[in-house]
């Protein structure tokens, strides 16, 4: 299993038509974003005074992420992307 560092997040991209809250995203919006599930998160980032700021997302969250963000990786037969938390646009609440 992949364990990301810092503010990085491992995502499993959902390969289906994207909907948010029951609304199908327009074609142009689908080209700019992807829906994904958070698989793992890093520990967060440290502030200048040393405090740890935890990630805003957790494993199991469904998120909307920038389409061209991140690096494609494989772990066994599974394909994932690793992105910085700043590339995650929203948490999708069901």
From Swiss-Prot:
The keyword Magnesium does not apply. Signal peptide: none annotated. The keyword Transferase does not apply. InterPro entries: Chaperonin_GroES (IPR020818), Chaperonin_GroES_sf (IPR037124), Chaprnonin_Cpn10_CS (IPR018369), GroES-like_sf (IPR011032). Pfam families: Cpn10 (PF00166). SMART domains: Cpn10. GO terms for molecular function: ATP binding; metal ion binding; protein folding chaperone; protein-folding chaperone binding; unfolded protein binding. GO terms for biological process: chaperone cofactor-dependent protein refolding. Disulfide bonds: none annotated. GO terms for cellular component: cytoplasm. Its main location: cytoplasm. It is found in: Cytoplasm. Keywords: Chaperone, Cytoplasm. Heptamer of 7 subunits arranged in a ring. Interacts with the chaperonin GroEL. NCBIfam families: PRK00364.1-4. Belongs to the GroES chaperonin family. Together with the chaperonin GroEL, plays an essential role in assisting protein folding. The GroEL-GroES system forms a nano-cage that allows encapsulation of the non-native substrate proteins and provides a physical environment optimized to promote and accelerate protein folding. GroES binds to the apical surface of the GroEL ring, thereby capping the opening of the GroEL channel. This is Co-chaperonin GroES. It comes from Streptococcus oralis.
């Amino acid at each position: 299993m992949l364990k990301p560092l810092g503010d990085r997040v491992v995502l499993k991209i959902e390969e289906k038509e994207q909907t948010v809250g029951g609304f199908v995203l327009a074609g142009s919006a689908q080209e700019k974003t992807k829906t994904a599930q958070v698989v793992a998160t890093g520990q967060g980032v440290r502030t200048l005074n040393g405090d740890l700021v935890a990630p805003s997302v957790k494993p199991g969250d469904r998120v909307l992420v920038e389409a061209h963000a991140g690096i494609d990786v494989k772990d066994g037969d599974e394909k994932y992307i690793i992105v910085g938390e700043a590339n995650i646009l929203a948490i999708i609440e069901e």
